[in-house]
């Protein structure tokens, strides 16, 4: 049993303290994204929110969750998405909408068709870490505003691509509303009290479903705050758990959420082990991220419509503007 507490601590393992989170193409081609076979949810959204969203990554669990959140919010889900493989004649059902999946070789032509029919479309990306930069470069080339919910990739190159193209983008390692608020508080503390934890020892443990290949972007963001607070940390020391058995027995993830969870623990100890601090945020399911992603798309759409001078945003910008539903 892994414990991040000092040996003298007799209280239960930190992950066990609370167990209340049991909730819930081939050849490039021109296409019509308003084909009769694509039936959109018959919900009338408020006029100010009536705009189309294309979710890239509907074949994945996170992308599918976002697509479902789009339709349940009364927004127009563009019935187009993409796969990393050239798979023909495949569709994914989202509510009453059949989303057609295209392979990578068709991306540019299909997206150009989408822009022709929906000039105000916003893309929400939940693909794979190794697709982040190529996707972002294409969105920027076509002038497509996008929300990058996919973590990983070369983040510096990602920001540079957006800056060089002057495109609109919202990039965040974390889309969960309340977790975003926690991150904002951590950043404020780091800015206001630099060096406050100088000399402290930090241990970090994160657990996600086995399908998550990269290290938690949220954990990286929190660690960056601790480093500003004076803590030295080697990312190679982070405990990354992806084994379901360990997640059940050691971390305490509810069995029904093994395939979709995000548990994080940060434990700080003073040089003499006499003082300790612990920060923990655990999420079961994907709804918190899906809803936040829709909020992000709404926010970015408003910025594009108002021709805002700022072009790159994050979820803290959304939070500060009070754009969370």
Curated annotation (Swiss-Prot):
Catalytic activity line of the entry: (S)-2,3,4,5-tetrahydrodipicolinate + NAD(+) + H2O = (2S,4S)-4-hydroxy-2,3,4,5-tetrahydrodipicolinate + NADH + H(+); (S)-2,3,4,5-tetrahydrodipicolinate + NADP(+) + H2O = (2S,4S)-4-hydroxy-2,3,4,5-tetrahydrodipicolinate + NADPH + H(+)
InterPro entries assigned: DapB_C, DapB_N, DHDPR_bac, Dihydrodipicolinate_Rdtase_pln, NAD(P)-bd_dom_sf
Associated pathway: Amino-acid biosynthesis; L-lysine biosynthesis via DAP pathway; (S)-tetrahydrodipicolinate from L-aspartate: step 4/4
Superkingdom of origin: Eukaryota
GO CC, one annotated term: chloroplast stroma
Record's keyword annotation contains Nucleus: no
Protein name listed in UniProt: Probable 4-hydroxy-tetrahydrodipicolinate reductase 2, chloroplastic
Organism: Oryza sativa subsp. japonica
